[in-house]
Regions:
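Phosphate/oxyanion-binding active-site loops and adjacent basic polyanion-contact surfaces
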Residues: 51, 55, 59, 155-161, ...
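Positively charged N-terminal leader segments that act as targeting/secretion signals
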Residues: 2-15
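SIR2/sirtuin-family catalytic core signature
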Residues: 19-41, 45-49, 243-361
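Short catalytic helix/loop segments, enriched in acidic residues and glycine
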Residues: 55-74
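Active-site catalytic pocket residues across diverse enzymes, especially alpha/beta-hydrolases
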Residues: 62, 191-196, 276-279
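Extended, H/D-rich, highly charged conserved domains that either
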Residues: 70-239, 250
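Short N-terminal helix/helix-N-cap motif within the alpha/beta-hydrolase-1
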Residues: 49-50, 189
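Glycine-rich, phosphate-binding/catalytic loops in enzymes
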Residues: 55-59, 196-198, 272-273
Length: 361
């Protein structure tokens, strides 16, 4: 019996496996040089477009206001008796309606804090945990449904086609781009304002308005009675993994637009900023930009970063190409336009390398 032929076949099999491994390793190495651009968007992105998606716009609308009792509207404090909709009264009472600045300053992070206050406001309003679970769960889901109804009916007629939001979206709308949205609004509705229809992968962390899977609530680290577990985001049937941390840590360029980096989403970003502020763990050649509204919001974000990176923000500036831009009244227009032009060139070079790598294989 001849053993040479089987031996040659076996050798050929392992040789093919070795070649395949080398090719995959080479591709992996090449990919590290590509520009993988991740755009992270929060409510400020929608507002820059001109969409009325703020918390203050919602609570001014009939979708919210119609559920507030007449008694509550005539009072400065929360005095509503238990009823099927008194969560709306409670949220209404947390606002100084005489101060328009206070109302306009309300953000989505505030409703999460107020839901915590609602769940921890003290005993005596309800006779039992079971009652709390059923009545208040009903109110919470009604609030969520009305928010969904409100956002589903906003008009896109007045979208600012010259906004920075549209410019950034056009910049990342390519094979190297990816979007992580903390908004509920459907980005595909912006296709009419873009140079090309969106073709990038989009992760909707808080659910998607189009299929009514929005997630409203609080984070896991909040302590309150288990009967209020329906308020926790991870308890939502729509909650799922989006690998946000991994995507950010693997990115070559990260753009935050209109996200406050506040406590409610703190856990998604802490590791990134901590690692990038440490000389031993920082990723080389990382580009990072944060688009925010004005000087006050810029300072607030720097305070958030200071918390996340153990007061080492100076290292963050040193260890990556990092800058913050203010969009209000085009304060940083020259810087922003310069950045978008440089981003365009980096993406173009990355796409060229990508095509060469594919053609070689």
């Amino acid at each position: 019996m001849c053993l040479i032929k089987p031996a040659c076949q076996l050798a050929g099999f392992y040789l093919l496996k070795l070649i395949n491994s080398i090719v995959m390793l080479s591709l992996s190495s090449m990919n590290k040089e590509y520009n993988n651009v991740v755009l992270v968007i929060g409510n400020g992105f929608d507002l820059d477009l001109g969409l009325p998606t703020s918390y203050s716009s919602f609570i001014r609308s009939p979708y919210f206001d119609n559920h507030v009792s007449t008694t509550q509207k005539g009072s400065d404090t929360w005095n509503s008796p238990p009823g099927s909709e008194y969560l709306f009264d409670f949220l209404y009472s947390q606002i100084d309606w005489k101060d328009s600045r206070h109302l306009d300053a309300k953000k989505w992070v505030d409703i999460e804090n107020e839901l915590i206050n609602f769940a921890t406001r003290g005993n005596g309003m309800l006779s039992s945990s079971l009652e709390a679970d059923e009545k208040e769960k009903k109110m919470f889901y009604l609030l969520q449904d009305e928010l969904c109804n409100y956002l589903s009916n906003i008009s896109y007629d007045n979208v600012n086609e010259n906004s920075y939001a549209i410019k950034v979206l056009n910049s990342v709308n390519n094979l190297l781009g990816e979007i992580i949205s903390f908004n509920y609004t459907d980005l595909s509705k912006l296709n009419q304002f873009l140079s090309n229809p969106l073709k990038v992968p989009i992760e909707y962390v808080h659910g998607k308005l189009a299929d009514k899977t929005i997630i409203l609530g609080v984070q896991d680290n909040v302590d309150f009675d288990p009967s209020y577990s329906f308020l926790i985001k991870t308890f939502s049937p729509h909650y799922k993994s989006h690998n946000v941390r991994k995507k950010l840590l693997n990115a070559d360029e990260i753009i935050f637009f209109g996200h406050s980096l506040g406590n409610t989403d703190y856990h998604y970003f802490q590791e990134l900023f901590k690692r990038q502020s440490n000389p031993d763990t920082a990723k080389d050649n990382l580009f990072m930009r944060i688009f925010t509204f004005d000087e006050e919001s810029r300072r607030n974000i720097l305070l958030q970063l200071r918390e996340m990176n153990d007061k080492r923000t100076n290292f963050l500036f040193d260890l990556c190409d990092f800058e913050l831009y203010r969009t209000k009244d085009k304060q940083d227009d020259t810087k922003i336009e310069g950045y978008l032009e440089a981003l365009k060139k980096r993406i173009h070079q990355g796409l060229k390398k990508s095509r060469k790598g594919i053609s070689c294989c």
